[in-house]
Amino acid sequence: LLDDGNLQFLVKETTAKTIVCEVVIGGPLKSRKGVSAPDAKLTLSAITDKDRDDIEFALSKNCDYIAMSFVRHADDIRELRWLMKHLGKDAAVIAKIEMREALENIEEIIEVCEGIMVARGDLGVETPAEEVPFHQKRIISLCNGAGKPVITATQMLESMTQNPRPTRAEASDVYNAIIDGTDAVMLSAESASGAYPVRAVEVMSNIAHIAEEHLQESSSDYAEPIAKDNDHSNPTQYISNAISKATFDISKVIQPKAIVTTTLSGYTTRHVAKERPRTPILCMTPNEITQRRMALVWGVIP
């Protein structure tokens, strides 16, 4: 399957360097499109030689996040961390969830990375398209509970690559992802190669503002995240969870203009944000890297 499943080939013959295929579903194939083999268990390294060059370049420019494609399990993230340590640099890791194997290991992946991207293009090829909404909601819920930022991406406003207005279904898609608790929504082809890149950003931003206003006006609290607050095996985490929950409860009573957090790594701020308070969270930190990374977290003004 190529280009998010738009083209379908049947492999007839392979050699060490070539693959001969029969075209089942044809169409135009642009450059740099992905290739998927659903249900295949890959034994290749998660990091290719080109990936290594790209990672080294990104780290040399002091990037804040590195998004890792085709993550299968937590060891893929650990391999990336080892490489960054070997290069003498560091960046936060966003794991792109786009393979069936990643869904099977999603909780351990969330535990070892700094954030998750629901990459629905390849995910909708690796799994039936009708299952993608379930996987998206589950991943968002798990990330909310763990206090890890989650990005919902791919084909959110796909029609705006050619049209100045989104479809009603696309507007609903963006809105519902935000209502479900995603920290960020992302454009791909709409802004990278589409005919209306600025307009697409404006539309997505407007939908986000409307969704957030409706959440603020709602008489009910945000959905309670699935958090492991009762885990006494990690005293530091348990105490942080308790303080964050207490902060949230107090904010509901006194309704302050803002919640101010002080943090070095961003840990405290993320744990307050995972409670989804209606009050803006001001993140105070002496660490410039933490300040930039916190821009991705829900409700936080770094």
Give residue ranges: language-model regions.
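Non-catalytic helical/linker scaffolds that mediate oligomerization, partner binding
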Residues: 1-302
